[in-house]
Amino acid sequence: VNKNYEIGDLVKIKKKRMEIFIDCGNPPANTFAKHYQAGCLAFELISNKQKIICNTGYAKYLSSKLALLSRSTAAHSTLYINNTSSCIFQKNKSINKVYGNSLIQKLRIISKNFSEDKNYYSIEASHNGYEKKFGYIHKRSIKILKQEDKIFGLDELKKTKKCPFLLN
């Protein structure tokens, strides 16, 4: 990804009246995963300084019950399968109390590509967070037109050889 648009593992594109942030990073090491939310390929869209599409939020300053609830849902602004997050979190309260947000199964970013030309910005990324359980790779493509306030997106599930069953 073009480092001019990447902050950490977030890709940020800002136009006059529109901003978009896309999470294109691998989960952190367990020692740094205390507040991780598992929203890989999730995005936030701001138009005219108003949030249009947003994530469920960062739980660092919430109560432990709200933080756990935030992590337990797959309701981030990204694709999910069968109400299952792309990462699996430790559900043992004692372990979470001592170590924070522990991940049992992590995803891996497979591809990440940012391109730009005179007409648009384009971001494509994919991860394997659903491969082990469902046999699919999740790919997200987002295109933002430069001259108009338009955004186009596509989510794809690509079947792998490890696919135990097909989705309807």
Role assignments for model-derived ranges:
Residues V1-L167:
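Catalytic and substrate-binding regions of extracellular carbohydrate-active enzymes
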